[in-house]
């Protein structure tokens, strides 16, 4: 460790009770997430309390250093990467503080699946159901304003949030709830929430036309700061503003969330079509019937599912070009079954109709069907090919009625550019993920992906759509957001100045980085022996001489992990790393081993450290049980 980082480590250890990591191996674990990006932090702090978070932010603010808050590190858009101090709330701040009759108070590191298990014992639920609920944290869900397949029934996190404890950019700790704005002339004596509410109210008033134009009520979710519904009953809902803010306005250290009665009976079916267009048109026609979920899959998604399990091969005919997973929920089984009957009948009346229908006969069938939405996508990350579907053009939201039009436009762009992509999403609220095939470690691919994204996002904007509606803008979408919606981006920048005038909180997300620059690149390529020239082989560091793998196989195994975080699963019904469940720290996750080996192979870590105690400590958390 160089003297400068040693000094930083000593400084931070002097003000926080939690862990501080400044060594190269520790930093390598936080240089990537579920996205294509790589950015090595200056330091990592794993706080034990709100006071630790506040002390870290104060230290950073005094020195003009950026702060990036992190939950599970599952972001697909580089949500928590950067060259400043990463604050990992998932290690220690994972306590359910209080459970009431209709609310729950939690720390930001609580895993969504664990929270649902806890609430389920009282027949309550948060309702919001991201596909990666087994790993993602409440703090991350707030930062992204997460929704999920059941948005039609339960909405997004912003609809559940009641109050938050937050650390602001100056290191102060405040409790935020819907607040009355401080009146003119009272700012000097008003408390901090009232002053912030007054500032936000002024921005909303000045930008009312912009917000109405670019965050219309006809679109279920919105990119950037969600400002369309912050004023209610004379109050400014500051907790709602933090939902989707991606840690750029403050760092949530506790949250009070409203809960609702757990869903009763449900009825689920998979409708299969010979055309993606017809599937999308059918989804629009089913919306008046009131489904709780309506997810869309293209033929590549279905083909991938067929390859993962023999049961999917039996369930899905190879001729299927698209599918809709439809769910109805009701207190009474007879009612939701009748509504599903109506949906199936409506689908079969479509132009050319659906070619097949698969109905879940019981809860086990339903859980299996739901794997199409929740588990199949994670297998993309292990595709053993250089060109694979990658998470770069994600999270497009269009008005649901415009979904068929957008998909036609998308197919035209892909065909003209001779691109291949996988398409899936939540058709019920117009949310689409596009995964173009690319080699994520090939430096030249970034330009091609950005050019494709520019075209696809422009098509969405042309029909009243936006980007970043469910997973945030992150590093990958913020530049496109500012170019596509400059007036709305300028309004977001005004809000950012109110909370973080120096721009130290997660710069480069939602608004462009200003005072603090965030330099981020795609992940470094891993040299493979069979592709290297003789000169490159001679220059390459000879790693792990006792390992029986050759370099090419080692690189392929490491590259099979993209950092999605599924190996951090805390879901009680799934099989995953028991060591991580016992000690949920990043170095205990299976992902950590791939991160360290990737850093060694790419040259970011000195190969001489391969035998160091820090590397050995990461390796020793694995006892080869193969549950990952």
Stretches with model-predicted labels:
Residues 141-304, 318-325, 570, 576-608, ...:
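Mobile "lid/hinge" segments at catalytic clefts and subdomain interfaces of large enzymes
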Residues 523-628:
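Ferredoxin-type iron-sulfur electron-transfer modules in oxidoreductases and energy-metabolism complexes
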Residues 1-58, 62, 72-102, 131, ...:
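N-terminal flexible segment immediately upstream of the FAD-binding catalytic core
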Residues 19-24, 70, 127-130, 205-224, ...:
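Flexible, glycine/charged-enriched surface loops at secondary-structure junctions
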Residues 12, 35-67, 89-132, 142, ...:
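N-terminal glycine-rich flavin-associated loop
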Residues 163-164, 172, 185-205, 209, ...:
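Polar, glycine-rich mid-to-C-terminal structural blocks
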Residues 255, 288-387, 419, 425, ...:
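Terminal amphipathic helices with adjacent charged low-complexity linkers/tails
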Residues 26-29, 75-77, 132-139, 223-226, ...:
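A glycine-rich phosphate-binding loop feature that marks nucleotide/adenosyl-phosphate handling sites
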């Amino acid at each position: 460790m160089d003297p400068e980082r040693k000094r930083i480590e000593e400084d931070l250890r002097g003000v926080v009770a939690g862990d501080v990591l400044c060594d190269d191996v520790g930093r390598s674990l936080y240089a990537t997430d579920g996205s294509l990006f790589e950015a090595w932090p200056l330091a990592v702090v794993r706080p034990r309390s709100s006071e630790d978070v506040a002390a870290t932010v104060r230290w950073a603010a005094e020195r003009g250093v950026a702060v990036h808050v992190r939950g599970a590190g599952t972001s697909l858009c580089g949500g928590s990467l950067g060259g400043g101090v990463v604050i990992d709330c998932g290690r220690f701040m994972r306590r359910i503080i209080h459970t009431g009759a209709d609310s729950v108070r939690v720390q930001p590191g609580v895993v969504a699946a664990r929270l649902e298990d806890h609430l389920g014992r009282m027949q309550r639920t948060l309702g919001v159901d991201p596909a990666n609920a087994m790993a993602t944290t409440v703090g991350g869900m707030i930062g992204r304003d997460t929704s999920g397949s059941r948005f039609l029934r339960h909405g997004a996190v912003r609809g559940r949030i009641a109050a938050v404890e937050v650390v602001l950019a100056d290191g102060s700790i405040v409790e935020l709830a819907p607040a009355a704005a401080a009146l003119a002339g009272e700012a000097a004596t008003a408390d901090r929430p009232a002053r912030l509410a007054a500032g936000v109210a002024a921005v909303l008033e000045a930008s009312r036309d912009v917000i109405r134009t670019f965050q219309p009520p006809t679109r279920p979710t919105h990119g950037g700061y969600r400002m369309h519904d912050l004023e209610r009953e004379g109050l400014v809902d500051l907790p709602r503003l933090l939902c989707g803010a991606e840690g750029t306005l403050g760092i949530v250290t506790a949250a009070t969330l409203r809960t609702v009665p757990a869903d009763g009976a449900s009825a689920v079916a998979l409708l299969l079509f010979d055309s993606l267009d017809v599937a999308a048109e059918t989804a629009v026609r089913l919306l008046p019937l009131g489904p709780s979920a309506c997810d869309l899959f293209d033929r590549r998604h279905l083909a991938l599912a067929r390859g993962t399990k023999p049961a999917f091969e039996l369930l899905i005919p190879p001729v299927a070009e698209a599918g809709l997973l439809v769910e109805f929920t009701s207190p009474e089984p007879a009612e939701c079954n009748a509504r599903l009957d109506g949906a199936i009948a409506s689908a079969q009346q479509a132009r050319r109709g659906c070619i097949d229908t698969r109905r879940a006969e019981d809860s086990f069938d339903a859980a299996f069907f739901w794997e199409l939405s929740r588990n199949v996508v994670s297998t993309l990350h292990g595709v053993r090919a250089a060109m694979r579907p990658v998470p770069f053009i994600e999270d497009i939201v269009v008005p649901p009625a415009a979904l068929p039009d957008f998909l036609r436009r998308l197919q035209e762009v892909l065909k003209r550019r001779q691109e291949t992509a996988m398409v899936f999403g939540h058709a019920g609220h117009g949310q689409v993920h596009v995964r173009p095939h690319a080699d994520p470690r090939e430096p030249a691919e970034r330009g091609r992906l950005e050019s494709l994204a520019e075209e696809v996002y422009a098509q969405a904007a042309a029909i009243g759509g936006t980007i970043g509606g469910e997973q945030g803008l992150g590093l990958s979408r913020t530049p496109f957001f500012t170019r596509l919606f400059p007036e709305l981006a300028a309004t977001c920048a005004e809000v950012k100045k109110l909370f973080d005038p120096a721009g130290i909180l997660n710069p480069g997300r939602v608004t462009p980085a200003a005072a603090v620059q965030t330099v981020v690149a795609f992940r470094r390529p891993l040299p493979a022996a069979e592709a290297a020239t003789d000169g490159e082989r001679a220059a390459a560091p000879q790693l792990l001489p006792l390992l029986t793998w050759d370099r090419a196989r080692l690189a392929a195994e490491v590259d099979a992990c993209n950092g999605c975080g599924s190996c951090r699963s805390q879901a009680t019904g799934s099989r995953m790393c028991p060591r991580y469940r016992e000690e949920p720290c990043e170095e205990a996750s299976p992902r950590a081993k791939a991160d360290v080996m990737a850093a060694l192979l790419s040259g970011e870590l000195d190969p001489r450290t391969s035998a160091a105690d820090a590397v050995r400590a990461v390796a020793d958390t694995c006892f080869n049980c193969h549950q990952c």
